Amino acid sequence: EAIAASKYDRAVECIAAQDYKTAWELLDGMEYKDSGEKQKSIKPQYYRALLTKAAVGDTVFFGSYEQDNETSNGKEDIEWLVLAKENNRLLVVSQYGLDCQQYNTSETEVTWENCTLREWLNEDFFHAAFSDGEKAMIPTVTVSADKNPDCDTEPGESTQDKVFLLSVTEANRYFKNGEERVCGSTAYAKANGVYAANDYTTESGVAACWWW
């Protein structure tokens, strides 16, 4: 009891000093007073501290989304791969296929600008995956309407988004080959109908999914 009280008091001091990383680690797993609620309350600040120190190639956790398809135990933290860092802003991509959605719900010619997937990512997914504090950390950026280098298709107009898909150009830039681009899907995504190639798996043996 005395040890827990000492750790709790130190965590409170760290929060007051804005040392959220140390405070989080002190509160983690603690069952004392309101330690669980206090840890939850500093989650955005803790993530910000980790994100500030993240480098290209690191994995970071940010936001939460149903992944194990066991809704009774709540959402799981989302794991992201850092692709680029500039002026303390990170470009990240999910390590796993999180859901299965159509690019567009109707069979018509459409670009990223007008597809239903763009709306779903920036509305449904955005509000489901991130808390208010986390949303405040996600900037709106210009997504350039780059022409597909392999197909003569109309790219549409550039957009302003918070969540978006990598373009073919970006996928080729940040991942050198198809093997590096292999991505496994979550149990939740599989339950929602994601296509998984059982003959092509990730290093951990998870069936690869189509994501770009």
Language model: regions and residue ranges:
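Alpha-helix N-cap/N′ positions at the starts of helices
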Residues: 2-10, 18
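Short, charge-rich amphipathic alpha-helical segments embedded
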Residues: 3, 20, 24-46
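Residue-level detector of conserved, well-ordered beta-strand and adjacent loop positions
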Residues: 12, 36, 83
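Collagenous Gly-X-Y triple-helix signature in extracellular proteins
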Residues: 47-212
